[in-house]
UniProtKB/Swiss-Prot annotation:
It is found in: Secreted. Shows more potent antibacterial activity at pH 6.2 (approximate coral mucus pH) than at pH 8.0 (approximate pH of seawater). Its main location: secreted. Belongs to the coral AMP family. It comes from the Eukaryota. Coral peptide that probably acts as an antimicrobial peptide in the surface mucous layer of planula larvae and likely also in adults. Shows moderate to high activity against some Gram-negative and Gram-positive bacteria (tested on E.coli, B.megaterium, S.aureus, E.aesturaii, B.algicola, Acinetobacter spec.). Does not show antibacterial activity against the coral pathogen V.coralliilyticus. Residues 26-73 form a propeptide. GO terms for biological process: defense response to bacterium. This is Antimicrobial peptide AmAMP1.
Amino acid sequence: MPSIRVLFVLLAVILLFMEVKMTSAASIVKDVDEDETLENEDGEAMENSWPWHGVEDTSDYSDLSDLANSEKRGTCIDLGSRLYCKLIRRRGMCRSRSHRARIAMMRCERSCGRCHL
């Protein structure tokens, strides 16, 4: 019967690990606070109200060249598993915690402030 106990312990460890991953993802979403004041590259405060009007999921676009040539620029916002752009007139700042998302956000800053996944 010790094998059944080992299986239950293993199952408990797996469930605990899944719980930790879910809470860390939730903390990333909470990081974008409604009342938080963001600053652009010029140090000017940007409005950060939820829901953001003009938020676009650029992962649905097959050709991003017309987006990059647009006069509007966006701020990349990491909401867990995807990056979203908040469209603004001037180039904004990109934020993230995970290494992979930081790389995507650096590409965002280099490409007219658009999110490229």
